[in-house]
Amino acid sequence: SDGRLAHEMLVRAAKTTQTNVKGIDATAGMGEDAFLLAACGYEMMLYEQNPVVAVLLKDALRRAKKHPKLKDITARMQLVEGNSVDELKSRVDDIDLIYLDPMFPGRQKSGLINKKLQLIQKLEPPCSDEVELFEAAIQAKPSKIIVKRPLKSPFLAGKNPTYELKGKAIR
């Protein structure tokens, strides 16, 4: 429901008074975060560079578009297989929001992470150039850049945020 959606940290971070918001998820993974934003009415472009993950996401979106409760949300999600950095650098049309959730380096903690995340971590190496990704996002001149990080990790590209939300495990 919309009430629960409003409590999601990502939704709170993305909140805007604008309508027809266009967003880019530059590090789509399995697309859950972009799905949350699309559920809020955002038009989302998802970039996934790993071909295996992209195929899994493409299949999930294809199936979701046939589901009566999901089709309106997934209609606002467009998947592009490839690296988002080049696209962000050459972007000419306006974009309202860019979401970055690069794969974090493996944790030293032995706590079990869920199976889906384990699979993604096996398929996708940690982001090789976070600075390039962040600089490309800045170059695209969005109204807002949202970065998801583990609580204890350094800020992306060493840049302090202008605004920060903290949860139990992420900020």
Model-predicted segments: where are they?
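S-adenosyl-L-methionine
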Residues: 1-23, 31, 39, 47-97
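Residues at the starts of beta-strands that form the adenosine-phosphate
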Residues: 22, 43, 76, 143-144
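Basic (Lys/Arg-enriched) interaction patch that binds polyanionic ligands
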Residues: 22-56
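Conserved proline-anchored active-site loop of SAM-dependent methyltransferases
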Residues: 23-36, 95-114
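A short, acidic, amphipathic alpha-helical segment used as a generic capping/interface helix at domain edges
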Residues: 83-87, 125-138
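Mobile active-site "lid"/loop adjacent to the S-adenosyl-L-methionine
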Residues: 102-133
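Conserved Class I SAM-dependent methyltransferase catalytic core
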Residues: 130-171
